[in-house]
């Protein structure tokens, strides 16, 4: 079978950039220049298909598009794979880069290299990708192209003397960039005559076609009459359809060949049947070994999600299952809370992932949700020499059964203007950080490497980092190991009852300070009741902080005009008895703000 476009004329490349460096806008420019979408259909951020992506100006789901371009009379196929830039979605980046031969490293001419860019460049270098530096936003008055080129050379060690200078917004330098992609990025390699070997680097659910796999054909070819073996599951399926990717519509094709990127429909009901990183091969003539080196995405942060309307528990399950069809990193299991009823313990890649999922559940499925404080997974060594992994504070065994607790640590890389160095180091010390390295990239920018406990960064670290550096610092992290720590469970009691959804695992030295701040905040948030309410913070059985909400008093003596004082006293005693009884059996409704307050407290 003859290839439609010779393999030497195919270029597979992705775009690496930090949030807000103009990656999606540059992708739009390349699409427009290659006429992949008509002017009428062209919208800004055409590669970002979710509303939430456009509103937040971020890319979450990696998209792909096939572009046709003619250079010097020869036809080329350019497969552009758009990748997310946020630290939470780095698993999307790693799988996308596995299917490319080259990457455009897009850096904002006004901001220079950021921490997330460095992390993604290292993934690209590990995959032996050809990296093309691209300086974007050169038309801005405060652009400093020479300094940024020097910055890239000093930080990453890539020669930038011939770096492309573009402005995606003003469409400057786009033709030159396309020519550079064709002349510099190598063509894919692979054996056209070998058995089919295709890497699944993304999958999603389509309402009409079921689960779809976005694949890169490494060896061989695939056609619509073939039977396919999914190597991870060992199951065989017929091919229902093959398509080329395009943001607005899928373009049908009869076959996909070595070096190409395309969409495969096998008529499956769930993306779990075609896991990302799995290998597709020919059922009759399978490839001997699957493609190596893929790790399934592991949740980093866990939180409880509970519907405010308790009868919508099943709706929440359905909604999570639907989101899971598109998001293999999302996992969940049912749990119950005395305070909140039935809900789910959900695993996320990070805080942005958690926010996005919660917002999508509320927006797309009309659910009202309460999210509990995010936690990480703790390794608890018990006195009987067994090990228990705890992701929910309520599962922590009693203190006398625990030999030691180990918590996960991450290695954080932070790039900051040097004027904010003092503030930043103070923040990192408050978060129990241990400095590993400090490096001046130039006179005005510093790169810090710290090891930090994971539970210190899942709360509010990102917001604090941005506020203490006026938004200029950038941050990236990678998990390293579990280390022993002095941790305790901090409980909040309202009217004598432990509110399990407000429990947190915290460093022993911070427990008093956090407990005091918590009860003071709760006092402001819980409405006054007809009886007195005690709010207490406790570690084990020891109360470490307390606040009292005074009761609302009804004037029961208002109807007594003059007369005997004993009549008034009798009414007041009766009221006192009633309040006592209320206090014994009364339940306090906690507002949603009380659960959110725990996230905001230092």
Curated annotation (Swiss-Prot):
EC number from the UniProt entry: 3.6.5.n1
GO process annotations (BP): positive regulation of translation
Catalytic activity: GTP + H2O = GDP + phosphate + H(+)
Keywords tagged on the record: Cell inner membrane, Cell membrane, GTP-binding, Hydrolase, Membrane, Nucleotide-binding, Protein biosynthesis
Residues that coordinate or bind GTP: 20-25, 136-139
Membrane topology value: Peripheral membrane protein
InterPro entries the record matches: EF-4 (IPR006297), EFG_III/V (IPR035647), EFG_V-like (IPR000640), EFTu-like_2 (IPR004161), G_TR_CS (IPR031157), LepA_C_sf (IPR038363), LepA_CTD (IPR013842), LepA_IV (IPR035654)
Superkingdom, taxonomy of origin: Bacteria
Gene3D superfamilies linked: 3.30.70.240, Elongation factor 4, C-terminal domain, Elongation Factor G (Translational Gtpase), domain 3, P-loop containing nucleotide triphosphate hydrolases, Translation factors
Signal peptide residue numbers: none
A family per Pfam: GTP_EFTU_D2
Keyword Cell inner membrane: yes
Gene Ontology molecular functions: GTP binding; GTPase activity; ribosome binding; translation elongation factor activity
Enzyme type, top EC level: hydrolase
Annotated Gene Ontology cellular component terms: plasma membrane
Chief location category: membrane
Coiled-coil residue windows: none
Subcellular location: Cell inner membrane
Ranges of residues in domain tr-type G: 8-189
Family matches, as PANTHER family: TRANSLATION FACTOR GUF1 HOMOLOG, CHLOROPLASTIC (PTHR43512:SF4), TRANSLATION FACTOR GUF1-RELATED (PTHR43512)
Family per record: Belongs to the TRAFAC class translation factor GTPase superfamily. Classic translation factor GTPase family. LepA subfamily.
Function, as annotated: Required for accurate and efficient protein synthesis under certain stress conditions. May act as a fidelity factor of the translation reaction, by catalyzing a one-codon backward translocation of tRNAs on improperly translocated ribosomes. Back-translocation proceeds from a post-translocation (POST) complex to a pre-translocation (PRE) complex, thus giving elongation factor G a second chance to translocate the tRNAs correctly. Binds to ribosomes in a GTP-dependent manner.
Official protein name in the record: Elongation factor 4
UniProt organism field: Helicobacter pylori (strain Shi470)
């Amino acid at each position: 079978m003859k290839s439609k476009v010779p393999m030497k004329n195919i270029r597979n490349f992705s775009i690496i950039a930090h949030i807000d460096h103009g990656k999606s806008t540059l992708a739009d420019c390349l699409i427009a220049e290659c006429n992949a979408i008509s002017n009428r259909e062209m919208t800004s951020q055409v590669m970002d298909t979710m509303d939430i992506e456009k509103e937040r100006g971020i890319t979450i789901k990696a998209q792909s598009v096939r572009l046709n371009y003619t250079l010097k009379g020869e036809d080329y196929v350019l497969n552009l794979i758009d990748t997310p830039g946020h630290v939470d979605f780095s698993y999307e980046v790693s799988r996308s880069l596995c299917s490319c031969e080259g990457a455009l490293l897009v850096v904002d001419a006004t901001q220079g290299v950021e921490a997330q860019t460095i992390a993604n460049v290292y993934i690209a270098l590990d995959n032996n990708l050809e990296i093309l530096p691209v300086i974007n936003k050169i038309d801005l008055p405060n652009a400093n192209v020479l300094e940024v080129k020097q910055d890239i050379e000093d930080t990453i060690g890539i020669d930038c003397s011939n770096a492309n200078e573009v402005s995606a917004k003003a469409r400057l330098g786009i033709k030159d960039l396309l020519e550079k992609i064709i002349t510099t990025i190598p063509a894919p390699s692979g054996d056209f005559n070998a058995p089919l070997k295709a890497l699944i680097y993304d999958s999603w659910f389509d309402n009409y076609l079921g689960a779809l796999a976005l694949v890169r054909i490494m060896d061989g070819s695939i056609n619509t009459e073939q039977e396919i073996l999914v190597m991870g599951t060992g199951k065989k399926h017929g091919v229902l359809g093959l398509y080329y990717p395009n943001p607005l519509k899928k373009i049908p094709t009869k076959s996909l060949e070595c070096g190409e990127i395309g969409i495969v429909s096998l008529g499956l009901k769930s993306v779990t049947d075609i896991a990302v990183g799995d290998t597709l091969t020919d059922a009759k003539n399978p490839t001997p070994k699957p493609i190596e080196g893929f790790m399934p995405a592991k949740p980093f942060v866990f939180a409880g999600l509970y519907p405010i309307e308790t009868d919508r528990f099943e709706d929440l399950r359905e909604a999570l299952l639907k989101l899971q069809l598109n998001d293999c990193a999302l996992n969940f299991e049912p749990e119950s809370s005395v305070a909140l009823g039935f809900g789910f313990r959900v695993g996320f890649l990070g805080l942005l992932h958690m926010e996005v999922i919660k917002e999508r559940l509320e927006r797309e499925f009309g659910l009202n949700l309460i999210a509990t404080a995010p936690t990480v997974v703790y390794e608890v060594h018990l006195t009987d020499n067994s090990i228990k992994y705890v992701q929910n504070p309520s599962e922590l065994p009693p203190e006398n059964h625990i030999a030691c607790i180990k918590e996960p640590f991450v290695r954080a890389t932070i790039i900051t203007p040097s004027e904010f160095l003092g503030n930043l180091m103070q923040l990192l010390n408050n978060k129990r950080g241990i400095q590993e390295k400090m490096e001046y990239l130039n006179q005005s920018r510093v790169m810090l490497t710290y090891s930090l406990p994971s539970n210190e960064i899942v709360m509010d670290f990102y917001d604090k980092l941005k506020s203490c550096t006026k938004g200029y610092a950038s941050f990236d992290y990678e998990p390293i190991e579990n280390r022993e720590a002095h941790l305790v469970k901090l409980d909040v009691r309202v009217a004598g009852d432990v509110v399990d959804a407000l429990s947190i695992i915290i460093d022993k030295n911070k427990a008093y300070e956090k407990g005091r701040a918590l009860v003071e905040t709760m006092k402001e948030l819980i409405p006054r009741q007809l009886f007195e309410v005690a709010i207490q913070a406790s570690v084990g059985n020891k109360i470490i902080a307390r606040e009292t909400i005074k009761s609302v008093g009804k004037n029961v003596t208002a109807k007594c005009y003059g007369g005997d004082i004993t009549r008034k006293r009798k009414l007041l005693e009766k009221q006192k008895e009633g309040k006592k009884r209320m206090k014994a059996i009364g339940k306090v409704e906690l507002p949603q703000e009380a659960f959110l307050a725990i996230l905001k407290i230092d």
